[in-house]
Amino acid sequence: MTHELSPQLLESFSRDFNADPKNQVISRAARRSGLLEAAYNPAVSQRLNRTFSIELDTDNVTNQQQSGRCWLFSTLNVVRHNFGKANKAKNFTFSQSYNFFWDKIERANYFYDRIIATADRPLTDRTVRGYFDWCQTDGGQWHMAASLIAKYGVVPRYAMPESFNSNHSQALDMVLADKERKDALTLRRLAQADDQEKLEAARTDFLSQIYRIMATALGEPPKTFDLEFRDDDKNYHLDKGLTPVQFYKKYCATDLDDYVVLANAPDHEMNRVLHLGFEDNIKGGYPNLFINVPMEYLEDAAIAQLKDGEAVWFGNAVGRQMDRKTGFMDLDLYQLDQLLDIDSHLSKADRLATGIGESSHDMALVGVDVDGGQVRQWKVENSWGDKSGEKGYFTMSADWFREYTYEVAVQKKHVPAEILDLLKNQPIELDPWDSLI
């Protein structure tokens, strides 16, 4: 059956709209200020009061600017708060550009291997298409950042500061993606011809060119540096000639082996380990593993870690029911259904299954307000600079956390043993087009 939009049907839609006088009032407000502003609910500010019963002592916020490095910024924020606590230097900041440099090269290395491994498949194969489509994006996961830190260490921000291309990564991503896609066609042809000598030579040459691009765009990473800072008591510290790995092992009180990522993806089987191998970025690094569990496990573990004095990395759908100016995140922030007289409600599972729900952004939990055992609100450290929210910090309702948070990275000691035991089971391999991408 076909359904043509006839003039008569369209005219009936117009009559329905004009039959209710309030539609014209709503339309004038929406056209003047936009749908979101017209639907804004000021009562939210009365509930979210920016006071927290548990709150970490943090300082300056970071700014990823026009780049998709939230996963890296939020992971480094967790690590730097641990560093600040251990070394009494709460305003110390790591270089995000340093790890970003190595991430791009490691992604290219993994991409070339995936292309070679699937050379016998057509370019129209859905997995191959996924490799090409997602070549050299900025996005990532906790385990990707952990892999970079474990292999390359970290450096202070002053040792490799931000550049235009790290802050505004679109052009760099385009150059890398275009080059790697062209390289992929060459590697496929050589792999199909089973010419291993030429294949390895081409692969190595391509990686050398990727390094050159990154060194041109960001500068070469330091091999050693001098650690120099004043702590919160104004005491001077100097440690010369550290490598990035030495610095991390000596000064950073974060053992990455101690962490696990809990996920709440109700469109997937519960109490199973999921592997997002498509986003693994380092050969021999941490695989992107999630334990998919009910939401209360994520909430309980996050609270326990905050009580223990440590920030919590979390992946979420920040674009939903969030006001960048105030930093409020609440399910009733924009009452669009009431404004437009519609019902758009979907369950968390249905949002994921239909593509509406996605873990599009990563931030750090640095506080929580618990009253009588019930969570009221969370304090969130974003990486959008100090001009958004309350000097860069956002306030998130308990319901928003439950509906729009999909992952938290927490220490294993905060997770029940029966949940950790699930890691002993074979993980479910997720496709490149899975809803958790």
Swiss-Prot record:
Organism of this sequence: Lactobacillus delbrueckii subsp. lactis
CDD domains tied to this protein: Peptidase_C1B
Entry superkingdom: Bacteria
Broad class of the protein's primary localization: cytoplasm
Record-annotated active site: 70, 361, 382
GO BP terms in the entry: homocysteine catabolic process; proteolysis; response to toxic substance
GO molecular function, one term: cysteine-type aminopeptidase activity
Record-level GO cellular component terms: cytoplasm
Name of the molecule in the record: Aminopeptidase W
GN (gene name): pepW
Lineage of producing organism: Bacteria, Bacillati, Bacillota, Bacilli, Lactobacillales
EC number: 3.4.22.-
Entry's localization field: Cytoplasm
Keyword set, alphabetical order: Aminopeptidase, Cytoplasm, Hydrolase, Protease, Thiol protease
Family note: Belongs to the peptidase C1 family.
Top-level EC class as recorded in UniProt: hydrolase
